[in-house]
Amino acid sequence: MANSERTFIAIKPDGVQRGLMGEIIKRFEQKGFRLVAMKFMRASEDLLKEHYIDLKDRPFFAGLVKYMHSGPVVAMVWEGLNVVKTGRVMLGETNPADSKPGTIRGDFCIQVGRNIIHGSDSVESAEKEIALWFRPEELVNYKSCAQNWIYE
């Protein structure tokens, strides 16, 4: 399939604690994207510092790492046509107040510090994040029987 790509999506501790995992996964499945990998884990501080390295000079960096380490996260890799761009649209804006109803953040969030989900912002970021969170053998290649009903 042309333009098929992968993205990294992580349900943050607030999304896990609020029981939104199933709803979020359901939205990606119903859109037609294919789950390639998933881990339910407590991310180490070192992993989180590397993941958010671009934000290391921001005043909220330490609090972000502490918060993300405070509970389990669901780390996932999704695959599909333009999944990075479409996934970001499905998530909504980083600040939930700017997110439209129908998006994950628009439907389930109020404050930016508790915006329940992370999604790669580019194909390059997705590749980096996937390599950081998953070993190559953890990515499962398979053909979904639904693909013929989703893509021409």
Swiss-Prot record:
UniProt cross-references to InterPro entries, sorted A to Z: NDK-like_dom, NDK-like_dom_sf, Nucleoside_diP_kinase, Nucleoside_diP_kinase_AS
Keyword Zinc annotated: no
Coiled coil: none
A Pfam family reported for this protein in Swiss-Prot or TrEMBL: NDK
Residue numbers binding ATP: K12, F60, R88, T94, R105, N115
Catalytic machinery residues: H118 (pros-phosphohistidine intermediate)
Any one GO cellular component localisation term in the record: nucleus
Cell compartments where the protein resides: Cytoplasm; Cell membrane; Nucleus
Activity regulation annotation text: Autophosphorylation at His-118 increases serine/threonine protein kinase activity of the enzyme. Interaction with the SET complex inhibits exonuclease activity.
GO biological-process terms attached to the record: cell differentiation; CTP biosynthetic process; endocytosis; GTP biosynthetic process; lactation; nervous system development; positive regulation of epithelial cell proliferation; UTP biosynthetic process
EC numbers on record: 2.7.4.6
Necessary cofactors: Mg(2+)
Principal localisation: cytoplasm
Source taxon at top rank: Eukaryota
Listed CDD domains: NDPk_I
SUPFAM superfamilies linked: Nucleoside diphosphate kinase, NDK
Catalytically driven reaction(s): a 2'-deoxyribonucleoside 5'-diphosphate + ATP = a 2'-deoxyribonucleoside 5'-triphosphate + ADP; a ribonucleoside 5'-diphosphate + ATP = a ribonucleoside 5'-triphosphate + ADP
Subunit structure: Homohexamer.
Family as reported in the entry's similarity comment: Belongs to the NDK family.
Function, as annotated: Major role in the synthesis of nucleoside triphosphates other than ATP. Possesses nucleoside-diphosphate kinase, serine/threonine-specific protein kinase, geranyl and farnesyl pyrophosphate kinase, histidine protein kinase and 3'-5' exonuclease activities. Involved in cell proliferation, differentiation and development, signal transduction, G protein-coupled receptor endocytosis, and gene expression. Required for neural development including neural patterning and cell fate determination.
PANTHER family: NUCLEOSIDE DIPHOSPHATE KINASE (PTHR11349)
Full protein name: Nucleoside diphosphate kinase A 2
Organism: Bos taurus (Bovine)
Gene expressing this chain: NME1-2
